[in-house]
Amino acid sequence: MAESQLNCLDEAHVNEKVTEAQAAFYYCERRRAALEALLGGGEQAYRERLKEEQLRDFLSSPERQALRAAWSPYEDAVPAANARGKSKAKAKAPAPAPAESGESLAYWPDRSDTEVPPLDLGWTDTGFYRGVSRVTLFTHPPKDEKAPHLKQVVRQMIQQAQKVIAVVMDLFTDGDIFQDIVDAACKRRVPVYIILDEAGVKYFLEMCQDLQLTDFRIRNIRVRSVTGVGFYMPMGRIKGTLSSRFLMVDGDKVATGSYRFTWSSSHVDRNLLLLLTGQNVEPFDTEFRELYAISEEVDLYRQLSLAGRVGLHYSSTVARKLINPKYALVSGCRHPPGEMMRWAARQQREAGGNPEGQEEGASGGESAWRLESFLKDLVTVEQVLPPVEPIPLGELSQKDGRMVSHMHRDLKPKSREAPSRNGMGEAARGEAAPARRFSSRLFSRRAKRPAAPNGMASSVSTETSEVEFLTGKRPNENSSADISGKTSPSSAKPSNCVIS
């Protein structure tokens, strides 16, 4: 229950009357009624209401036009969901009168049915101390000849960023500043979060299209949009705008003021830019995270027609496992928080329409529809398990109770006599032994052969191996070696190579 309602329950509470002359004056019921007359009946009804309530005109002409343009009636979610589920034939029939919306079971819901967007790229952890607190004021035009202009101050902050870049702006169309942000995100791997006003998103996307960005350059950039607080009335809602403007870098520096990231603001208009450091940054840190939590996603990949990241397409069941913290211990590549839910939403949109059970579950609430969708996925959606790479070993075959690798099947024994200098060996004369002599008795048991009498090389065969090698001593400066690798008897000693 709201604090004002709790105060009304107190017997000793007396509502204090706040007049227009007091500084605490904020809300007036008579002005709200005049605003409803403006939105419902136009300028003439607004003037009549002011005369009836004996009020002075509290809205200027541009404000009246902007309020009428931002006003929109409420939309009933239940008839809209039913209309999407109907066929084209039923859509031609006259729609029935809208039913009254049912009351919610919870007057003050303590849990949202939407996912809170996470800061998946990371956030700076500055602790309790953020450095020395300083305040510096910059103006345009500069007061001092050597003072930097406002755009230079902003670009230097972005180019020196190492941890995180956070931007809150109502209108962002300066390509030079955004190019510095893209370079910081792509080259230095600095996480970038940008929050824009909903009305200024289309102009921001126009600037991005002119820069001809690629998918790998914006992977460390998250763009979201928010609206103003708004004004709610029984007949509709007036949508507000975002007027905050500040740039936070590394959690210890903030630039805020009237300066916006546009060419006109840095060359034509008069602006102020306040540079804050130290503990002065903490309120801006909190404000940015609160704005990010209520913001809506702006998909740059879809808006700019980019391919996006190439990843594996998991089913909904596997996706729920991968975002579980206990599976993160054994998963080699964990998706950022919230990525799987966005993937499920994209898959549903690509499928073309709502599931068959959505219309039936709409009457039971959002939770019933989610449960029904999950149970349906277990039966209908093919489960795709994450790929498992095999162990990089050679193919093994079973032979005589032992494992034999395929890499050793085609080995041939070296000839006992080295080829002659002219290359006319036994193989050239057609007198070479068949190749299967070695492979057929690779691991056969055989008695030891006596050592070669010449002492040049010895062939040793153990009980477990018959592999024979021709070994010798490396020739030195005083010894001579021929092309076969043999050395003189005076400098070579018998060497045995035993494989056990």
From Swiss-Prot:
Positions of modified residues (N-acetylalanine): 2
Alphabetical GO biological process terms: signal transduction
Compositional bias segments (type: Low complexity): 425-442, 458-468
InterPro entries in UniProt: FAM83 (IPR050944), SACK1 (IPR012461)
Region (DUF1669): 2-300
Modified residues (Phosphoserine): 4, 479
Protein keywords: Acetylation, Cell membrane, Membrane, Phosphoprotein
Gene3D superfamilies from the UniProt entry: Endonuclease Chain A
Subunit structure, as described in the record: Directly interacts (via DUF1669) with CSNK1A1 and CSNK1A1L.
Entry comment, domain topic: All members of the FAM83 family of proteins share a conserved N-terminal DUF1669 (domain of unknown function 1669) domain of about 300 amino acids. This domain mediates the interaction with casein kinase 1 (CK1) isoforms. Therefore, it has been proposed to rename DUF1669 the polypeptide anchor of CK1 domain.
Official protein name in the record: Protein FAM83F
Organism of provenance: Homo sapiens
